[in-house]
Amino acid sequence: MESWSRCLERLETEFPPEDVHTWLRPLQADQRGDSVVLYAPNPFIIELVEERYLGRLRELLSYFSGIREVVLAIGSRPKTTELPVPVDTTGRLSSTVPFNGNLDTHYNFDNFVEGRSNQLARAAAWQAAQKPGDRTHNPLLLYGGTGLGKTHLMFAAGNVMRQVNPTYKVMYLRSEQFFSAMIRALQDKSMDQFKRQFHQIDALLIDDIQFFAGKDRTQEEFFHTFNALFDGKQQIILTCDRYPREVNGLEPRLKSRLAWGLSVAIDPPDFETRAAIVLAKARERGATIPDEVAFLIAKKMHSNVRDLEGALNTLVARANFTGRAVTIEFSQETLRDLLRAQQQTIGIPNIQKIVADYYGLQIKDLLSKRRTRSLARPRQLAMALAKELTEHSLPEIGDAFAGRDHTTVLHACRQIKLLMETETKLREDWDKLMRKFSE
């Protein structure tokens, strides 16, 4: 509806744009005779719209379309002429009304590319979806850098819960949405309704809980919401950009609660997984690219899945626009600037600094000639990371480490690869450092 689009544009000049994006953009408008039906994904959004925006919505829709009657309903805009199911104004979530708690149905386990870096996280999300509320994985916390698939797995788990039991009420929220809703409820003195909505769902999925850091009242309300859901054996799935105990500003009691269930890290994908992701994403787009092009992207883009997708999208778009075949030469030409920016972001000096900080050393220690174990291992690890994450040759890496010979760098890379197969601590250090480069 054109009138609805104009209504949203006007509202963005009257209310904070982030509020319009969070609470009003999810609504789907449909004209039915002398009324406009606004479809919301869940009762929580309907209640907020009814309390804060409905009066102004009626005024604007009347102005732009001449229709003043506005009906709120749960669901999606129907493709047929059937009438919508009106919202139950008693505040109860009827099991006969389809409930869509902001879940993106595009994300599922079938289109999630599994690799060593995310294998455990995928298995944990699958178990949570199959047995929601089981204490072995409640809460389930997925943590790791940006663009590694945490939200994908969260959506996939929620979608499976709905497939197994269509009446299951799964709500997904970004942490900012939880915070914004709570602030509005405090302002409107409607905290009882705020709490009731969360207590009536079967599963709660919240993204990026590090956003709660330093927000005492938000943590207070989430703490009580967590307890109510946990005691009711309702599944809780959360994501964070790092292990919660490393997040400054989170209350100790909340950190303790988060440790009750299962916490699983998602690490940056290895080369094989990156290549598989590129090929899978290309198939999703109906594009065909040679394996060597997928290998090129996987080799150059190391940090996260979003960077891989960005490179692929750029490549496919230019190929479609120019009509040229996707060859290695075409790919190198198209992605030149993107790859150069990636290399500038992760340079050898940056690697040296991050490794030195991680081990509590100074960069001059890594570059020194001393061969004590406390220095030799971090130095070898830094060299191996430089080989993995940059396009520098072995001699160039050696030069960056105080003029060491290329054979020294080669030995370091082989040694680290060999030791990671048997030394759990070294493998953990490698994974943690790789996560830092994906942040």
From Swiss-Prot:
SUPFAM superfamilies: P-loop containing nucleoside triphosphate hydrolases (SSF52540), TrpR-like (SSF48295)
Matching PROSITE patterns: DNAA
Binding positions (ATP): 147, 149-151
Pfam families, A to Z: Bac_DnaA, Bac_DnaA_C, DnaA_N
Cleavable signal peptide: none
Sorted UniProt keywords: ATP-binding, Cytoplasm, DNA replication, DNA-binding, Lipid-binding, Nucleotide-binding
Recorded GO MF terms: ATP binding; ATP hydrolysis activity; DNA replication origin binding; lipid binding
GO terms under cellular component: cytoplasm; plasma membrane
Residue segments, region Domain IV, binds dsDNA: 320-439
Domain of life the protein comes from: Bacteria
UniProt KW Cytoplasm keyword: yes
Spans annotated as Domain II: 75-101
Principal cellular location given in the protein's record: cytoplasm
Spans annotated as Domain III, AAA+ region: 102-319
Domain I, interacts with DnaA modulators, as annotated region: 1-75
Gene3D superfamilies xrefs: 1.10.1750.10, 1.10.8.60, 3.30.300.180, P-loop containing nucleotide triphosphate hydrolases (3.40.50.300)
Subunit-structure text: Oligomerizes as a right-handed, spiral filament on DNA at oriC.
NCBIfam families: DnaA
Family: Belongs to the DnaA family.
Described purpose of this protein according to its UniProt entry: Plays an essential role in the initiation and regulation of chromosomal replication. ATP-DnaA binds to the origin of replication (oriC) to initiate formation of the DNA replication initiation complex once per cell cycle. Binds the DnaA box (a 9 base pair repeat at the origin) and separates the double-stranded (ds)DNA. Forms a right-handed helical filament on oriC DNA; dsDNA binds to the exterior of the filament while single-stranded (ss)DNA is stabiized in the filament's interior.
Alphabetical list of PANTHER family matching this protein: CHROMOSOMAL REPLICATION INITIATOR PROTEIN DNAA
Free-text note regarding domains: Domain I is involved in oligomerization and binding regulators, domain II is flexibile and of varying length in different bacteria, domain III forms the AAA+ region, while domain IV binds dsDNA.
Name listed for the protein in its UniProt record: Chromosomal replication initiator protein DnaA
Source organism of this protein record: Xylella fastidiosa (strain 9a5c)
